[in-house]
Amino acid sequence: MFLAACDDDPFLVEWTENPQEAVLFALDRDELNSASAYNMLARLQVVIEDPLTEGRWDFAVDRQNGKMVFLPPRVLGIPSKGALVPFPGMEFEEMQRAPSDTLLYVTDKPVPVELGTIYVVRTHEQIGSYGRICVYYGKLEPLEIDLQAGVLRFLQDTSPVCNNRSLLPPR
């Protein structure tokens, strides 16, 4: 039997911060089928050449003009809400809320990957609880950029709350 107090919010998503590291490989590497994209909510490395991924990723990484860059899906011709906002000089723990100004989100051009910068990521649209169409917000911090090898190691965490810009769990 399920009992709830009158003050309980049945739609409240209880979650805790859980930053995790991930590694991605630049698209221009010679090896085929390397994970070069990332799904923030699922915390999955994605091989974008795999037809089963069907654009279910939020950004890819590549090397362009001597720099490592994030590629929002639209840069590669994938219709998506996936986007990034860089915040230079900010600490991972300081980033508590994704910006509400949609004009800040980069959707259509490469975003340089820089150490010492935190990136807010808006995910691709996906079906959330109760059948709603949702985007989710997360943050990431590049930890290591190996430009020669085309490898990026980063720390990320994502809120599992549909369409909610808060990057911290409810208190």
Q: Model regions: which residues?
A:
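Surface-exposed, beta-sheet-biased, low-hydrophobicity segments with strongly acidic/polar composition
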Residues: 6-171
